[in-house]
């Protein structure tokens, strides 16, 4: 154990509280100016829980209830990830399964994958599975595709990890073609070729597609040139970097000659409440969530680093905080160019508390608010 770890472990609760306060004072107060929150900014729910904080059955019941509430409140979409072999996101190894369950419990909300790890699957299976969900939902499916990043995931892959980005591009185009009803040749047994056309036929003629971007500028460029939307997050990129990436995406979209302006979805953590103990209430769940995230990336889980990261979330551009703070962040994201904000709600808080908070999240208005300068 390092000397820093030993010193942190020796802190009593009051000393840890004072440490947190000291870290917080190092963050400059935001300068604010009035701005109107655009009505076009869509809001959705993102699900990306760590599988070490609840039992699976209870978690799935929570997802279905939250999705039903979002549907009733007129929210735009729910998004489900694909993760393998780790706790982080581990409740969703196949987003089509959760999507199918939600499709039968909702009426209007869109149901999206955020994302499908394209290199791990045959394009025909992706098209088939999601066409089922499209039929169950009456045409509410959309897919964001990712290239995968963890080498362990590629135990499931047909192709080499080093070729994952090229494979992703080919897979997306194959899925889109199959979705439209085209027939594609695929290798079969004994050196033969199968002419594949998928069933069932989906409700939507065209599949809405996004490319998942962690913040790497080239991914925004690739998506724009191909005519895809972008699904990104504030985890791993700053607000200035996000603004630059979105501006780059819009310019590349225009230069490629596409109609419209593309589509950008930004995910951020969300729990909106005026409760006076909010910081202390959120801390254990956020520490555990960040620890799970750092575990998969090989990062440190020392208290001071977790606390620093937590306070960055609390005081930065997340929807963790009061309604006034959340409205300000939504305005900032709209000003940065976001078309949709995905609210990640399942980061370890008790399900009852999250569900109780959803009306406040859904009721964030479009009146004049404050925006960080």
Give the label of every model feature segment.
Residues 1-38, 373:
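Flexible, low-complexity inter-domain linkers and amphipathic docking helices that mediate domain-domain
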Residues 28-105, 110, 207:
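N-terminal beta1-alpha1-beta2 module of alpha/beta enzyme domains
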Residues 30-39, 162-198, 240-339, 370-372:
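An alpha-helical appendage that flanks or caps ligand/catalytic pockets
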Residues 38-56, 120-187, 229-231, 236-238:
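Flexible, glycine-rich active-site loops centered on histidine and acidic residues
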Residues 47-60, 116-124, 205-215, 273, ...:
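Active-site mouth loops of central-metabolism enzymes
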Residues 74, 82, 102, 133, ...:
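Conserved, mostly hydrophobic/aromatic
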Residues 77-98, 117, 235-237, 344-355:
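Glycine-rich, proline-tolerant flexible connector loops at the mouths of alpha/beta enzymes
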Residues 89-113, 167, 171, 358-373:
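Alpha-helix-loop-beta-strand connector modules within alpha/beta enzyme cores
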């Amino acid at each position: 154990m390092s000397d820093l770890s030993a010193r942190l472990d020796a802190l009593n609760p009051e000393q840890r509280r004072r440490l947190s306060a000291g870290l917080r004072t190092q963050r400059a107060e935001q300068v604010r100016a009035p701005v109107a929150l655009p009505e076009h900014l869509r809001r959705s729910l993102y699900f990306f829980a760590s599988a070490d904080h609840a039992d699976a059955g209870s978690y799935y019941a929570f997802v279905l209830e939250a999705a039903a509430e979002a549907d009733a409140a007129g929210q735009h979409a729910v998004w489900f990830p694909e993760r393998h072999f780790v706790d982080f996101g581990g409740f969703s190894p196949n987003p089509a399964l959760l999507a199918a369950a939600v499709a039968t419990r909702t009426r209007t909300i869109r149901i999206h994958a955020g994302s499908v790890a394209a290199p791990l699957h045959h394009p025909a299976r992706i098209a088939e599975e999601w066409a089922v969900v499209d039929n169950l939902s009456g045409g509410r499916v959309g897919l964001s595709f990712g290239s995968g990043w963890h080498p362990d995931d590629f135990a499931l892959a047909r192709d080499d990890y080093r070729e994952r980005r090229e494979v992703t591009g080919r897979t997306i185009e194959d899925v889109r073609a199959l979705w439209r009803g085209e027939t594609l040749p695929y290798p079969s047994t004994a050196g033969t070729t199968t002419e594949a056309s998928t069933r069932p036929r989906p409700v939507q003629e065209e599949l809405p597609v996004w490319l998942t971007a962690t913040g790497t500028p080239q991914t925004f460029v690739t998506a724009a040139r191909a005519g895809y939307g972008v699904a990104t997050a504030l985890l791993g990129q700053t607000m200035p970097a996000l603004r630059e990436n979105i501006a780059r995406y819009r310019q590349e979209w225009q230069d490629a000659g596409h109609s419209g302006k593309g589509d950008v979805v930004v995910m951020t953590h969300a729990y909106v409440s005026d409760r006076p103990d909010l910081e202390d209430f959120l801390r254990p769940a956020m520490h555990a969530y960040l620890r799970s995230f750092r575990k998969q990336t090989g990062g440190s889980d020392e208290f001071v680093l977790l606390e620093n990261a937590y306070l960055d979330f609390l005081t930065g551009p997340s929807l963790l905080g009061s309604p006034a703070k959340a409205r300000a962040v939504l305005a900032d994201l709209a000003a940065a160019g976001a078309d949709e904000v995905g609210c990640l709600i399942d980061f370890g808080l008790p399900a009852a508390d999250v569900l109780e908070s959803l009306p406040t999240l859904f009721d964030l208005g479009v009146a004049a608010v404050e925006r960080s300068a």
